[in-house]
Regions:
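Juxtamembrane intracellular "pre-TM" segments in multi-pass secondary transporters
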Residues: 1-35, 60
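Extracytoplasmic gate region of multi-pass secondary transporters
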Residues: 29-86, 141, 146, 175-180
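A membrane-interface helix-boundary motif in multi-pass transporters
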Residues: 97-100, 180-210
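Multi-pass alpha-helical transporter architecture, strongest
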Residues: 116-118, 204-226
Length: 226
């Protein structure tokens, strides 16, 4: 039986389409591509901290490798909490309103990322910054890449929609590594035999991605649902 039969939901005209036609429908849906782009930017910031956070804490903030690794360890743990919270926050607290939790999580991730990147703070404050950022980005990803994507396509097309979003996310994660590595290497100079890092350009790249990741779906949500 279909999901609609099990739940008592009404069938839409798209639900009756063959699978191949539904896949074409998803690929032609501009809303899915907006979500895919937004999700890609989420992955840029998410994997930037995972991949480059230890180096950043060592070279920019002067932490020993042991403490830098511990701080990023808190980042990984907090992301699990954010993922668990996302559905409850959107459906129970905000009553299935996708925009408000997206703005909340997006702003929180943007602010805490900026504080992490641009403030000279100690061990505990950096733990707080990366933990809150990771929690917020976990919520943001689940709402944008999951709930929003599911909301705008027929039930039978959710697999195709999530596939498009997932592929774009992982492609962006790979491109992020290449771009971030280039920006870090290009802005590193050698002084008296010691590498001096300038993380400014790559930090602005990460922060811009964090802003676009939630602004894009929020501004286009009404259009995507039509």
């Amino acid at each position: 039986p279909s999901v609609q039969n099990l739940t008592g939901e009404d069938m839409t005209k798209h639900d009756a389409l063959p699978t191949r036609d539904l896949q074409k429908y998803v690929l032609k849906h501009p809303g899915i591509w907006i979500i895919a782009i937004s999700s890609a930017f989420i992955y840029i910031t998410k994997y930037a901290i995972t991949g480059w956070g230890v180096l950043f804490l060592q070279k920019e903030k002067g932490f020993p490798i042991e403490e830098a690794t511990q701080i990023i360890g808190f980042y990984a743990a907090a992301g699990i909490v954010g993922t668990v919270m996302a559905g409850w926050l959107s459906d129970k607290v905000f009553r299935s309103d996708r925009v408000k939790p997206t703005v909340l999580a997006g702003m929180l991730s943007f602010i805490t990322l900026a504080l992490f990147l641009f403030t000279d703070s100690g061990y505990m404050m950096n733990v707080v910054y990366v933990s809150v950022f990771s929690l917020a980005i976990g919520v943001l990803y689940c709402i944008v890449a999951g709930l929003m994507a599911i909301d705008i396509v027929p039930r039978k097309a959710t697999g195709a929609a999530l596939g498009v979003v997932g592929i774009s996310s992982y492609v962006a994660a790979g491109l992020q590594d290449i771009t971030s590595g280039y920006l870090i290497q290009f802005n590193t100079t050698r002084v008296d035999g010691v590498d001096v890092y300038d993380f400014g350009p790559v930090c602005w790249f990460w922060l811009a991605a964090a802003l676009i990741s939630f602004i894009l779906p929020v501004l286009n949500w009404k259009k995507m649902r039509r």
